[in-house]
Structures are given as structure tokens and as C-alpha cells.
Amino acid sequence: MSESTPEQLRFPPVAGLSVRGDFDGGALSSDFGPMILRGVDRQIGLTERLSAAIDDRRHPSYVTHTMRELVAQRVYQIACAYEDGNDANALRRDALFKLGLERKPLDAAMDLASAPTFSRLENGVSARDLYRMARAFVETFIASYDAPPKVIVLDMDHCEDATHGQQELAFYNHHYGNYCYLPLFLFEGLSGKFITAVLRPGKRPKGVENAMILKRVLKALRAAWPTTRIVLRGDGHFSNPELMALAMDDPYTDFIFGLTGNRVLTPLAEPFLEHNRKVHALRCENARRAGATVPHSTRTYHEVDYRAGSWPGPFRTILKAEVMELGTNPRFVVTSLDLPSPECVYRDLYCARGQDENFIKMIKNDLASDRTSDHSFLANQMRLFFSCAAYVLHQVLRSDILAGTELANAQPSTVIIKLFKLAVRVVQYKDRVRLHLPSSCPLKALLKHVTEKLFFAPSILTASG
């Protein structure tokens, strides 16, 4: 009988000593992150809400892992940069992931779920399950406020999710030049809090489709906050009469949308652009004479008399008339807001929506929301929700637990590298578990701060199992 040779890692000699490595360390983990994520999750009850939204059709006699454990395991893995479901095959025995899922870390009978289990989960959810999960995200957002806020900004944006196979409802999008999905993300623009998301086919959505989604979200928000001022904000893809009418049906809702130039609107900007061309040329000439830096652009803000025939009412149309060295850059915004000046509407209110794109980048680049490679459209929606849940945990960690620290504004990838990827030796006794972290850890004080805040934070997570 042949004997297996342990897999070794070889390194160049150091100080006359040979150096070898192996994977026989035993109860060691390279991920401290699940313990932090567990603390955040217990505080907000996210995976409890999401799992409760799924109709568990499994026979109780054959259930080894509860639905809440499955959802939490997948979300925690993504939040620790393990976006591939196959990673569960190795991580199911990881002591820290088991401890984060409230299982005994060194008990072989308490191993976590494997990749095939998650494949069955993703492909077993129904459209009704996913709808309830979308509502669970909205409920989590509402619960994140101790009292009804005076105002929230509901930022909406689409994001390209390129597809490379034969996924259901993956269509060619001329704007992006490839086959893709086009998920819709909703965030609260002032805080960065996630509201919900919907995976959409790759074609450009119609106004009635966006309005159908927003109507359900607004209904849930209004049930909790009857008089909160809500401002809908989006780029030119959302300046359609259906969303405008939706805002106008609610006395406490307004909108501010980008507006695409057309054969009627664009000529209205020309007098202002012509004036700014002369001003810009004069400013540049004066700067050159004085040996100063030549101004990059000259811009002014105006309100123009314009109303599209499809609009449900008369709204303010704001123009940014900008002249640059390479030409003109007229931009338009339409809004139902009466009081702010044209400059305030465009510069301070509308341009702030660019932060929404940063939130989407975090979900997409750091938390793999575009890992939608399953053939099933519903399974890919489930994968999107897993990444969104990972974002929620990171956002709460960053804004609540890490507030005032060096990582208060860090992206998820930075938090993962600095806080989550720490070597831990796990020792399990009869009545306790000890976690031994590196003696030379450079973030001891920060880890102490984080764990103490999570330890004393109230938990709304009900007992699972």
C-alpha cells in the first residue's frame, strides 16, 4: 500500500536553514472576519430576515444546516472575499467560519455546508422567495433608523453585469457593447445605506418597469415613515413620466433626474454657452498675461423654459452651461423642487449622486455582485442578494463600529485585508474557546475597540437551529 506524501511548500534557505511549509497546522484559520461579521449580523438581524423570507421546502428529518446558517455562511464567505461557491468545500471545516456560524469549531460533526448544498439552494428558490428577500432588505434599511428621518435621498442606478455564457435573459446591450444583465441598485444617498436591488435583463428598462419597482419600495417606506421627505434621484435613464407621476402622487416625495438633450432642449442652452465662450476666452487670456494657471472651464447655471409633452406637470429644467478648452458641455436636470437655486440643484443636489456609483463599485469589485454565471436567472438574483447582504454588513461595520477610526471610510477590500485576514489559532476546551492571534499584530488596539463594541451591542438575532 502506497503512503501519501504530505504536500510541502519549498522556500530558499534562510541563514543556513532549510525552509519548508505544509498544511498540517490543524486548528488554524486565516480569517478572523467571521467573528466580526457575526457580531454585526447579530446586531441588525440581517441573515435572520433574509432566511425567514425563503420557504424552506426541505424535509425536516434530513436538514443538517438551517436556512439561516446557509444564508449566513454564504454571505460571510463573500464578505471575506470568498465569492466562489466552491470555496465552501474547503471553508466548511474552517474553525473560525464554524465559530462565526455558532458551531463548535473543532467538532467534526459540526462542519458547515458544502458547495453542492449552495447550488441546490440557489437553484431552488422561487420568484416569491426572492420578492420577500427584496422586502427583507427594505425592512432592514427601515430598522436601521431609531426614529423616522426627516429626509432621505433614494438614489437609483443601473450597473452593467457582463455575461459570458448562455445565462437566461442575458441580452445584448448596445450602450455597453456586450451581452449583460442590468441590475438596478437602490441606496440612501446621504448615508450609503443599501435599500434593495433587482437583477434585470440586459435591455434598457422602460419607465413603467422602474416605476413598478419604486412603487413597491415607496409603499414600504411610507408605511413606516408617513411624513419623511423622500427625494428620488437618478441620471437621465430615469427622467421618464412614470417616475415623475409616482413622485407627484405623494405630497412628501420629490425628484431630481438628469435630462438628455434633444432638438428642442439643446438650442435653449446656446445663448448661455455663447456668453460663456467669450468669458472663458477672456479669463484664459488674463491668466496667461498674469502668468497664472489657465482656468479649466467656465460654467454658469440657469433655469430654462422647457416642458416635454409627456411630463405629468410643469417642472423646473436646470441648465449647466459649461465651456472648456476642448468645447462645450451643456448638462440638464429636471426637478420638482421649487426652492433651491439652479446652481444648488445641479452642483449640490444632483452631482452628489455620483457617490452612488462608488457604492456600486464596492458591491461589484470588492464583493463580486457580478458573479452571476449560473444558467438560471433566479439563481443569479439569489447570488446578487448574497453580495448585497455582504455589503450591508460591511456598511454597518464601517459606519457604526469603525466610526472615528482609521478605517471609518475604508472600502470593503481594505477592511478585509486589515481586519479580516488575520491568522488565528483555535483552542477548544470543555466549557470555552480561546482564540490566539499573532503577537505582532499591528492592529491590536483597533481589534480591541471593534470586539468590545460588538460585545456590548444589543442583539436582535433570535436563536437559530
Feature roles, as predicted:
Residues M1-P205, E209-A224, D249, R398, ...:
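Dynamic "connector" segments at or just before major functional cores
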Residues V40, Q73-R74, G85-A88, S114-F118, ...:
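Short, conserved catalytic/metal-binding motifs centered on acidic residues
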Residues P205-V264:
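Domain-level cores of phosphate- or acyl-group-handling catalytic modules
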Residues N89-L91, P105-L106, I230-V231, L402-Q411:
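Short, glycine/acidic-rich hinge or "gate" loops at secondary-structure transitions
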Residues V40, S341-M382, F386, A390-R398:
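Short amphipathic alpha-helical "interface-anchor" segments enriched in bulky aromatics
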Residues C159-D161, S191, R200-G202, T260-N262, ...:
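Short, glycine-/Ser/Thr-/acidic-enriched flexible segments
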